């Protein structure tokens, strides 16, 4: 009996030993200091307060390349929200993240720096430490300073393909620094892909989804409440737009922080906001484009025409305009758009009011936030190049002035009754005013 007992004990020990070798347990820490490190072999990770996010090493299913990234710790479907070395992976399983000389570096087996924060400053009397915050932000700070304004470095300033609540996409008009999202190469390759989602300041800041030089989607300008072409549901989340000190920025906040939510650029070329459903253990799509509707596609209809969802012909000419090529228009080829029935004369010109619109592209627009709609109308009539005008901000009955001086492109009409859409006033010759 004793012999059998000993054999069982030995077999159990060997089984546990081999399991630990094949599947090493993950050890977590909350703060990384200069006396600690994360290595691939130790399977050690850095965890945020509340165990929401986790930072560590990972590799893709189809390769032996290793990356340093952040993912949701409690989400069963491993979902990465940030990758430090997405375009410079480790080629072997020997890698270390450590703080060295007040600078956390990601090193491969030959002590060559694969990724670094490039941080050179720090308070020698207060050692530098690194944390993953509850919102998923990986930060470096002096050990005696927890204030956000004192962060020495943060991953939120270097987004990859995902926007988290409180994370900003921004454009600095002074330095030209643009923080934007870039898609993955594929579902199993986190390197930089073909699609980007960025804020273009132009006359009125707007978001563009693009693939190289090709524009795929335009959000519409900020109307004081939201970007006119972006869905917004105050029950789940709401948008925040910041414009100050030569810098424009956008972020979203959750109305209930117990929900996990993310906005990301897909490797297949669309923008999607998802929320995690713990009951079904699945990500639910809150909205996605340009998949939701053909009207989301950039310039789905040509000049001086607008897109309408759920109609037999999605493209319609503005009042006072006719298809530039009737035969193509009848064949549902709308790229040529529409042309005026009557040329503008400057004398007797007026306007047709188009309600609930996504404003046309603002590349050639003139913006004056100091005047109202009446003065805006006068300025448009006095400018022979003016083709349309609108309020810049729909709050408080409408303020500011946007004057379009080029062709009206990429417009869309929304459902009647929308409370946060804009009206567009298109200039017409007297003969075409109804």
UniProtKB/Swiss-Prot annotation:
Pfam families: B_lectin, PAN_2, S_locus_glycop. Keywords: Disulfide bond, Glycoprotein, Self-incompatibility, Signal. The keyword Secreted does not apply. Residues 1-28 form the signal peptide. Residues 338-429 form the PAN domain. Residues 31-153 form the Bulb-type lectin domain. Glycans are attached at residues 43, 61, 111, 118, 256, 310, 385. The keyword Lyase does not apply. InterPro entries: Bulb-type_lectin_dom, Bulb-type_lectin_dom_sf, Pan_app, S_locus_glycoprot_dom, SLSG/EP1. Disulfide bonds join 376-401, 384-386. It comes from the Eukaryota. Involved in sporophytic self-incompatibility system (the inability of flowering plants to achieve self-fertilization). This is S-locus-specific glycoprotein S14. It comes from Brassica oleracea.
